[in-house]
Amino acid sequence: MSINAPKFKFLGLTAIALIAGLLYTQIDYGQDAMQSTKITEPVIENKDNTNPAGYEKVTLPLSDVENIDGQIEDYLLDMWPIMSEQEVQAIIGSKDISKKLVNDTLGHVEFSLTINVPSHYLDPAPKMLWELNIPEFTSRIYQIYNNDTILITVWPNVVGAPGTKTYTGLYNIFKLRNWPTWKDPESDPLEPGTPPGPGNPLGLFAAHYDENSLRYFHGTNKNGLLKNEYRALSHGCVRNDNGNIDKMKRFIVKRMITSQDISWWANSKKSMVYNFTEEEKENFPVRIKYKTFDIGSDSYGDYIIFFKDVYGYARGNKWSKFDREELMTFSTVENITAEYKAIHKPNQFQLPDDKLIPIVESLISDHKDYEKYYFADLVAGTQSETGK
C-alpha cells in the first residue's frame, strides 16, 4: 500500500488539475461568448461572403432557444422602434444559428445567433425626414443615409379641418412634450386645461415642428377617427395613432437625442419638455405637402390614386400666408404625365402619350378618390373599347 500511495496521490492531483483546467476553459469560453454578443461585425463583400452589400452581421446573445424569433424582434424594436413589421420579418428570416461544443467531457454547448441587418439601421446618429401629405392623410417616415432617402414606415393621420388647416411647409422638429397638458385656445383663459393622460386630446406625446403656429404632431384620445376615409378633422395639428406616436417617442428619445440621455422617457408618465439643440433640429426635418394624386406600384402592378382636394386649393381657394405654394401639386394632365414618365424611364415599360394622355384625361374627369387604378387594367379597358 505504501508503495502505491504516491501513485494514487499523483493521479488524484492530476485529475483535480484536469478538472480545474476544464472549468477554467469553460469560463473563458463563456466570457468570450458574452463579449462577442456586443460586437457588430461589418459585412465585407467577397467571394466567401454570402451576405448582400449594405448589410452588417450582428451577433446576439441567446437567453434561450425556445423563442428565438421573439428575441430577435425584441432586439430590433428596442434598437429601432419605428421599424416596420415587414422589415422585422425580413431580418428574422436572415437568422443563422450555430452551436459549438465547448467541452467534450462536460458536454457544454454554446449557441451563436447572427442576423443580417441593413447598415442604415446601425447608424449611431440617424437623420430622419417626416413627410406628411395632407389630402392623403398619411405620413411617411424616411431615413436620410449616404445621400439616399430610405422609406422606413407609413401610417395614417388626422389633419386640420378646412376651417383650421394644417399648413404646408419645410420645418424641423424642435421640441418634445411627454404626457402633455392641453387647453383649447378658444376657451376661457381662466378655465383649467385638460390634464395629462389617456383622455387628453394630445394623447401621450407631442413633437413640435412649426415655431410660427400652434401646429404639431401628437397622439389622440379618439383613435377611432384614424379609421375614417376622410380625416380632415383637427384644429390644425396632425394627430397620430397612439401606438405609432409611442413608437416615434421611443425612437426619438433613444436614437435622435444626442446631447444628453433622455432614453428613460420611453416608459415615463411624467409631464416633461425637451428642446432640441440646433444639431438635433437639423437631423429631423419635416416636409408637409399638398398633393392630390400619387403614382405607385404594389404586387398587382403600377397604379394611380387620387386624393380629395380637402382645402379646395386646386379649385382656386386661397391658402394661408404660412403655406408654401411650391409644395402643392394638383391633379392635372401635365403633372400626372410628368411624374409617370419620371418613374417609368424610356428603357422601361412606358405608355406612349397617345395611350397615356387619354387615360389620364378620362380619370381626372371621372374617378373615385382613395381608390387605386392600375395602368394595366386601364390599358386593357381602353383597348377593349376601341376594339384593338
Task: Describe each PLM feature range.
Residues S2-T14:
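N-terminal Sec-pathway targeting helices
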Residues I19-V238, N242-K388:
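N-terminal pre-domains immediately preceding structured catalytic cores
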